[in-house]
Amino acid sequence: MKNYILIILLFISIPAFSQSLLKGVVEDSNGNPVFAANVYLKNNPQKGFVTDFDGKFSLSVNNKTDTLIVSFIGYNTTKIPLHSIPITEFLKVVLKENSQTLAEVIITAQDPISEKFSVVKLNKLNIYFNPFSQGDPLKAITSLPASTTTDESANPSLRGSSADRTRVVLNNVPIYNPVRNSQINGIGNFSIFNPEIIHKQYVYASNPPLTYGNTSAGLIEIETINDLPSNQLQLSTSLASAGVFLSQKIKNKSFIQVFGNSQFSDAFIGINKASMTRLNDFYTRDLGVNFHGNIGKRLSFNSFNYFIDEGYNVNVEAFSYSGKSLSEKIRIFTVNSLKYHTDNGVLSINNGIDNSLKKFSFGDLVSDNKTNQVFTSADYRWFLSENFTLQSGISHDYQRSRFNDSIPVYYYALSPESPNYHSDTTVFNNILEAYSYFNWNMNNKWILSSGMRSNIPVNDQSFYLSSQLGLKYRMNKNQSFLLSGGKYHNYSTPNFYVKEFTLLTSYQVALDYSFEYKKTSLTAAAYYKSEKGDQIINSFFHIDNQRTFGIELFYEQSFRKYFKFIFSNSFLNQIVEINKSQFKGEKDYNYFIKTSLNYSNPKTFSLTLTYLARPGNYYTPVTITNFDNQTDFFQPQFSNNINSSQYNAYNRIDISLSRYFKFDKTALIVFASLNNILNTKNESEVLYNSDYTETHFDNYQLRTIYFGLVWQLNY
């Protein structure tokens, strides 16, 4: 369900007319219209409305003794007695930004201390409106020039680094493998997060804040909502799914959100049979519960709990064997956060428990992987003054992974009849770290930030110290520069190919520029990073060092009221080092274009056209073979010239259409999408015949169609 609810917030409520109709507009102090502000009557909140793109609203009024309430996140709630205004005249409501005292800010503040140093900050609306997201919080990142994800998955890869160097954090707790429908290599089609629970999502493309550990590339920080504007029930169905989502208020501003989804494949594969020649079956069943409770004015508690049962059946070719690949996975995790607000600070205690069991089989390869994670942290943010904030903390991250495998004796002999051997491996890691981080608003133009994070070695670990420095310069209210650099460490996540925790290191420096003016946004960046450590690509190649230099450009323009145009491009120069020899990196691109054109008219429909283009990835081909009489298979030998071949250029055009219908308290949303309109065969993997004399290619997603509807009730 969560992949397709993106159109729910694309349109506004159509006013319901009655004998007394109050019309008006909601603006901020600068005269800008406020979109999606809540407008309702105090004694009849279920008949409230949401302002449209121009900040306008219409509300039926039957009792002039009632009170009009107008609210929006980040602004003071406005209350207007109806008897004090002429109902028949157009009403102008001006919202003022929150201007609490320091103590009040401490009680209500939710932004992280490093917020001003994030490259991008997204909220729920940004995710839904994002033309590349498909309603997925992590896929929303792919529209950014900093995103270098090339496998059409939700696994975030930032500025040329591998996904295993980037971390996703939910309410201060790291979530490893934050994707579903994942393969043996960790690639996942969609994330496990529902956008309806998200308050804000911060993207640190480089130099992740050292308030968090175990990341050496980038960081995605997700915060769940802390206030529920209204009760809501959603029912959805589509070509491959059915789902329900319920948001319910409880007393004292507490609330609960419950959602469940079921995915099925028969109809989807049947309609897209020509494009789904390898996919035989898939299923997903998940259940999530998010609870937020306020215990007095100073104490709050949030608990997010999630369960998923998923699997797939797909035809796979590897080396000279072709057969079915089967996967099943069950996962359950909980993330809990307790916050206590003192007079001059915020104490946060966080805990996460994550357990999963995954089974995978292909030919003579069988793998059962059981993982356990327990994370605990305590942080205190101290507001020393209005301009200086210090945060310190300690964290412990315990990870355990057991692999019960049947492994091919010969990597190239994968048929069920080929010899294999049993392996039972258990690895664990304890990451105990302490940190300190400060943010100093030097004046109205300069902001300085710095942090240090060190491990406390256990179990014969090596000592390491991470450090960073950031300097932000605000030229004016529209433009800013951010210069940041640092040294970072993280442990790799064990997988089928390498069953160990490997310490990785990264040195980074980046310069980011941002310009915002009315309906125009422009960002640019230049960065350099050197990543060291025995990073595993597959069972054949281990990268010792990877150096990446990149340049990025992003442009967004809204025009003619209903149109929005987005264009981004990236340049990457990447070099990898293997056994002291240098080669071209897999993601060495002279362009990486992402562009979209969106038309959203709440009275008619929403139409979005997206286009992605980049050079093909580099790969290492098989150059020599020897026939092995013992296995009756040819043994391939890869070229010594790593990444000497390249897949064809990647090009993809998608189109999506949606329509919103309003019926009093309910709404109906219908949607459809056509992906890869031109049915372009974008090469994803090179395949060979039995003696490796001929090659052919597996492709990314071909042309597919998808459609469905969502019914929504506000009460």
Where are these regions (language model features)?
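Periplasmic N-terminal accessory/gating domains of Gram-negative outer-membrane beta-barrel systems
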Residues: 89, 112-166, 172-208, 219
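Short, acidic, small-residue-rich periplasmic hinge/interaction motif at the N-terminus
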Residues: 27-30, 37-42, 71-76, 85-130, ...
